[in-house]
């Protein structure tokens, strides 16, 4: 059912590939509808983390309420714009933002056309039953080819795009057309204002004054200050303190009704209790069942984080707790390493998420940290029949106890200019990928589908892909189960001590090559000591590669001019004894660069 009020509301989001101008378009819409004056405008208004602006990416979902007056009849419409992240790692964030909308504006760059994430995000919008409104951006560029792109959208995605607005978000050209298209094409929300309350949390973050602020989309019912609410997945009850809308800053209102997008605060202390995707209902008149689609965020990549200065352990713990308040996808538990001391094992959504967390710890909390090599979750079937999951290579059981191991696989979709198909296929082959199929999108561009082990992707797949295709390829992936593989644990032994932080799990047939390169890399990086340091790579008890860092030595014979050979021999023997003793007590520091360079090797 639809009320008169709801007919004038449109809830929509903007989806696009990275750098196709999504956040810029959002800025222009805010400016055009007078939500922000020209003076308040800054680039990427909705990206309010410093890191987001710096990298030009959107990490957290944001929302803004625009008031649009149609020129022809003067009708006022409330347009709720929900800005979504565009990166693979934050797919779940995108899916919840989509669930809060009825329509999606699909931005396509007029010079580049459809890219892998354009497709991924567009299919996601269609799966959520949204009306997709294509918009072609950057038509002010000399290399723009809007007509070809329109055909491409129709052929590849199958959306009618003959009347797609041609805009330039940078100069503000034809922005009015986008607003008009949203009003005409995006369906108005429906929902029972009198029914039991049902609201979807599509984002939540911690404010030091208000506690957790939940960004919500109300599907049914009404919520106002004083309402007693229950979070269905967390199974906790609270009393609402304040409700309001975003203009992008907070504006307090009396109540929010079905169809509205806004925020509530209810002195919730922890972001974990207000999980994104959870359903809010009323305690006295609860909804029968929650809204569909909630799932806890799943960590795909694990890594150890250690403070460089071990006395900063408590500070690191506080930093992680504060970041976790705002990021329900981050999880961590304490762990110790012989080489690095006390630290934490953290789970991330993917590599970008991991990099961003490391940057935020270093910038916002002023802590220097070491990150160990990222690892995925392996499943190990032991000989006694038990199945365990391994996130840290050091916890892998002895080879004699393992029946078989499985590693996660992803389905990768790569779109590349046809000149580079050979190079891309070679890369996927090198990364143990299996070919699924390929199809031509247009004469010059090809879409390749591969199954690739996740372990191969988390190191440097994206960088290699970009460098092999001169930066033209785009890439998207989704988890596709597990597959059985012959895997072994590769240990690095320095001065006859295993450095647990450098251990990694590798395919059996690649262990030798990997061990060789790691030993060579470490030889270059580890500073010379006064005694020689053997660097060994081992699988189980078998040494597969060895390099030696030569000792620095003092010339003890300098003071002997001529003289007896036995005198010289005595001095050399004495030096040798000293070196031997030093080697037994000396310890070797592994510099931070060692960890980084080992991740980056091909």
Curated annotation (Swiss-Prot):
- Domain named tr-type G: which ranges? 7-190
Q: Which reaction does it catalyse?
A: GTP + H2O = GDP + phosphate + H(+)
Which GO terms of type biological process are on file?
A: positive regulation of translation
Q: What is its EC number?
A: 3.6.5.n1
Pfam families for this protein: EFG_C (PF00679), GTP_EFTU (PF00009), GTP_EFTU_D2 (PF03144), LepA_C (PF06421)
Of the GO CC terms on this record, one is:
plasma membrane
**Membrane topology according to the record:** Peripheral membrane protein
Q: Where in the cell is it found?
A: Cell membrane
Q: Does the keyword Zinc-finger apply?
A: no
- Which EC main class describes this enzyme? hydrolase
Q: Which InterPro entries match?
A: EF-4, EFG_III/V, EFG_V-like, EFTu-like_2, G_TR_CS, LepA_C_sf, LepA_CTD, LepA_IV
Record flagged with keyword Transcription:
no
Q: Which Gene3D superfamilies match?
A: 3.30.70.240, Elongation factor 4, C-terminal domain, Elongation Factor G (Translational Gtpase), domain 3, P-loop containing nucleotide triphosphate hydrolases, Translation factors
| Chain sites annotated for binding GTP | 19-24, 137-140
Question: Keywords assigned by UniProt?
Answer: Cell membrane, GTP-binding, Hydrolase, Membrane, Nucleotide-binding, Protein biosynthesis
Q: Which is one GO molecular function term here?
A: GTPase activity
Q: What family, per the record?
A: Belongs to the TRAFAC class translation factor GTPase superfamily. Classic translation factor GTPase family. LepA subfamily.
Describe the function of this protein: Required for accurate and efficient protein synthesis under certain stress conditions. May act as a fidelity factor of the translation reaction, by catalyzing a one-codon backward translocation of tRNAs on improperly translocated ribosomes. Back-translocation proceeds from a post-translocation (POST) complex to a pre-translocation (PRE) complex, thus giving elongation factor G a second chance to translocate the tRNAs correctly. Binds to ribosomes in a GTP-dependent manner.
HAMAP family the record matches: LepA
The record, for PANTHER family, names: TRANSLATION FACTOR GUF1 HOMOLOG, CHLOROPLASTIC (PTHR43512:SF4), TRANSLATION FACTOR GUF1-RELATED (PTHR43512)
Q: What is this protein called?
A: Elongation factor 4
């Amino acid at each position: 059912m639809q009320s008169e009020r709801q007919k004038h509301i449109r809830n929509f989001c903007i989806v696009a590939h990275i750098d196709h101008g999504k956040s810029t378009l959002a800025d222009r819409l805010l400016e055009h509808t007078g939500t922000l004056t020209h003076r308040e405008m800054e680039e990427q208004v909705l990206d309010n983390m410093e890191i987001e602006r710096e990298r030009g990416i959107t990490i957290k979902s944001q929302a803004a309420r625009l008031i649009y007056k149609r020129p022809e009849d003067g009708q006022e419409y409330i347009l709720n714009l929900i800005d979504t992240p565009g990166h693979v790692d934050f797919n779940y964030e995108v899916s919840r933002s989509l669930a809060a909308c009825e329509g999606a504006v699909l931005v396509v760059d007029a010079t580049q056309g459809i890219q892998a994430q354009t497709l991924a995000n567009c299919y996601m919008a269609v799966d959520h039953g949204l009306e997709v409104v294509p918009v072609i951006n950057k038509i002010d560029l000399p290399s723009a080819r809007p007509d070809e792109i329109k055909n491409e959208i129709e052929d590849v995605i199958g959306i009618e795009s003959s009347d797609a607005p041609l805009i330039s978000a940078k100069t503000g050209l034809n922005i009015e057309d986008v607003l008009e298209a949203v009003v005409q094409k995006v369906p108005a929300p429906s929902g029972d204002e009198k029914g039991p309350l049902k609201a979807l949390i599509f984002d939540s973050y911690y404010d030091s004054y208000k506690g957790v602020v939940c960004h919500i989309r109300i599907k049914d019912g009404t919520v106002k200050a004083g309402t007693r609410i229950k979070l269905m997945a967390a199974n906790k009850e609270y009393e609402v303190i304040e409700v309001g809308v975003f203009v992008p800053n907070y504006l307090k209102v009396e109540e929010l009704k079905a169809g509205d997008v806004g925020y509530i605060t209810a002195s919730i202390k922890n972001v974990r209790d207000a999980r994104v995707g959870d359903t809010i209902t009323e305690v006295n008149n609860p909804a029968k069942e929650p809204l569909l689609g909630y799932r806890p965020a799943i960590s795909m990549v694990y890594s150890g984080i250690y403070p460089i200065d071990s006395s900063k352990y408590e500070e690191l713990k506080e930093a992680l707790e504060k970041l976790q308040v705002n990021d329900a996808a981050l999880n961590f538990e304490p762990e110790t390493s012989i080489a690095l001391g006390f630290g934490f094992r953290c789970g991330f959504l993917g590599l970008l998420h991991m990099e961003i967390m490391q940057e935020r710890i270093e910038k916002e909390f002023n802590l220097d940290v070491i990150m160990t090599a990222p690892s995925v979750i392996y499943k190990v079937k032991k000989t006694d029949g038990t199945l365990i999951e391994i996130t840290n290579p050091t916890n892998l059981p002895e080879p004699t106890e393992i029946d078989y191991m499985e590693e996660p696989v992803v389905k990768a979709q790569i779109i590349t200019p046809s000149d580079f198909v050979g190079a891309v296929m070679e890369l996927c082959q090198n990364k143990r990928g299996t070919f699924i199929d390929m199809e031509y999108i247009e004469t010059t561009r090809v879409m390749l589908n591969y199954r690739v082990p996740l372990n191969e992707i988390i190191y440097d797949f994206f960088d290699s892909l970009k460098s092999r295709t001169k930066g033209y390829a785009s890439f998207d992936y989704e988890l596709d189960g597990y597959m059985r593989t012959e895997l072994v644990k590769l240990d690095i032994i320095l001065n006859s001590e295993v450095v647990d932080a450098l251990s990694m799990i590798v395919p059996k047939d690649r262990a030798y090559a990997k061990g060789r390169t790691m030993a060579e890399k470490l030889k270059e990086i580890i500073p010379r000591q006064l005694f020689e340091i053997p660097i060994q790579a081992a699988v189980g008890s078998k040494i597969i590669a060895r390099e030696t860092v030569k000792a620095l030595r003092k010339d003890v014979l300098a003071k002997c001019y001529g003289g007896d050979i036995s005198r010289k021999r005595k001095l050399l023997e004495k030096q040798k004894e000293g070196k031997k003793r030093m080697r037994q007590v000396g310890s070797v520091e592994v510099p931070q660069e060692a960890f980084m360079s080992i991740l980056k090797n091909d």
